[in-house]
Amino acid sequence: MAVQQNKPTRSKRGMRRSHDALTTATLSVDKTSGETHLRHHITADGFYRGRKVIG
């Protein structure tokens, strides 16, 4: 089993954790229906970029 030889410094620990932050989902408002949806996804009633794509 691998065992470290030296204790990692606070700096190295911080560098490793620098990419661990969570980000919030970016939301958009549809032009036609005014509905909030995830970016690059259709709305619940089937609109994408102002056009009806489903239903």
Curated annotation (Swiss-Prot):
GO molecular function: structural constituent of ribosome
Name of the protein described by the UniProt record: Large ribosomal subunit protein bL32
Sequence segments annotated as region (Disordered): 1-27
BP GO terms, sorted: translation
Naturally occurring in which organism (per UniProt): Yersinia pestis
Record-level GO cellular component terms: cytosolic large ribosomal subunit
KW Ribonucleoprotein (keyword) present: yes
Domain of life: Bacteria
Family: Belongs to the bacterial ribosomal protein bL32 family.
Keywords noted in UniProt: Ribonucleoprotein, Ribosomal protein
